[in-house]
Amino acid sequence: MFDNEEGQGPKSTFTTYMAEGDQLFQRGEYVKAVESFTTALTLQPDDKNCLVSRSRCYVKLGDAENALKDAESSLKDNKNYFKGLYQKAEALYTMGDFEFALVYYHRGHKLRPELQEFRLGIQKAQEAIDNSVGSPSSVKLVNKGDLSFFHNGVHPQNLNPSNKKESKKHSKKTDKGEKTAKQLLGELYSDREYLKKLLQDEDLVKCKIRSGERVQDLIVGSISYLDTRMAFWQQQKPIYARQRDRKLMQQQWSKVLHKPPSDPTRYVLSSLEEIDTALSAGYTESGLNKARELMKVVKDWSEDALPNKNEVLGNLHSYIGNALMDLGNMDRALHHHEKDLELAKKCDLTDSKSRALDNIGRVYARIGKFQQAIEVWEKKLPLACGGLEKAWLFHEIGRCYLELKRYMEARDYGSRSLMAADDISDEKWQLNASVLMAQAELKLSNYKASVLHFERALERAKLLQDDSASEAIQKALCEARLRVTQ
């Protein structure tokens, strides 16, 4: 659609280029979509919808700065243009400026409260703020806890048993609060801990300085001051900390691209951990981009520099494949998981082979190719380790057979899944396997057997306090009982 001759502009209409860009975006071809929207903007430079559409592409490509520029341009004439507000929030979120993103999600929600996108944006931005340095709700920055013992003249050792139980109950929250305190106070954290230890010196706290002030009052005042500053930093640090960390990460990446680190193995392990953390936390595109960048770096290294190079590349293909699967790009996901399998076979890596077969089967099952999923997962069976993996694998193969209307095979694999779950006393997989067997027996017209399995499944659902599962099983059980009486 573009003319190659120099000096000639676009050959088609604005609407055509917009439609082309939308189609390319839907197909995940974001670079080409940017080109189409850019050409459209040469025809209508201030079109708000086109600017927002190109901004969406930039977000997908990880180019948050250009995404933000386009979003702000779309708001130039109308500050309340809700699509522009949403896109500006998305761009800020991608940049890691979660507080400002939250502001624009709220503005959009106020204008268009019926749109789910703004509600979800508020939720994810708030969660990101909490996760960046710890949830504010997990740290109560008031003079309670340790300090209250001294104000009340009670030493921590004199707690009654009920208070000790309460303390244990909240120990996890306290640990998280201390971790947050370390992050916020930095070097001052050790000073705060030292002051708290001084308070436990009964002789010292009774002393007075020349001005007549008690040492205890001075120490408590100092700790209170640090807690007050921590409350302030709890709100302020996320933005500048992320900006600093982002610049540091960019510097590290640029160094890597020009000069290999002195210890490639340690660098790779650290990077893989970052990728895993990002993907586990739901930051799929961020984790995907990191994995792709690391893959570029690792491919340029020799096996002398990184002896387990192929194993690392296999891990990266696996991460990228899982991220693409989460993003709905099944074809590319399958490609990367097959690359992982290829490397695992080449290097005779049993665990990696098992992982790749697992993921390839999941892709096939997600796109409805149940026979292919079965064939792949059956190759994984000899590699399955432990009862939990076997319970899951037998169940998934059985589910595929159920989808293919091969009910006897579905029942048999359900039985194998239940046996594996019984071996490890896993109630969740006992529940899943019982439901699978009940469904298969129902389809085979073995109604009494179906009722029996549904009843067992219902018992386990109640034990697990899974209300939604209990409700669904109860309905299926009623249907099966009705069939018995007919």
Swiss-Prot record:
Signal peptide: none
SUPFAM superfamilies associated with the record: TPR-like
The TPR repeat ranges on this chain: 14-47, 49-81, 82-115, 314-347, 354-387, 391-424, 431-464
Domain of life: Eukaryota
Gene3D superfamilies: Tetratricopeptide repeat domain (1.25.40.10)
A matching Pfam family: TPR_12
InterPro entries to which the protein is assigned, alphabetical: ODAD4 (IPR040111), TPR-like_helical_dom_sf (IPR011990), TPR_rpt (IPR019734)
GO cellular component terms, A-Z: cell projection; cytoplasm; cytoskeleton
Gene Ontology BP, a term: cilium assembly
Keyword annotations: Cell projection, Cytoplasm, Cytoskeleton, Repeat, TPR repeat
Quaternary context: Component of the outer dynein arm-docking complex along with ODAD1, ODAD2 and ODAD3.
Role this protein plays: Component of the outer dynein arm-docking complex (ODA-DC) that mediates outer dynein arms (ODA) binding onto the doublet microtubule. Plays an essential role for the assembly of ODA-DC and in the docking of ODA in ciliary axoneme.
Record-given protein name: Outer dynein arm-docking complex subunit 4
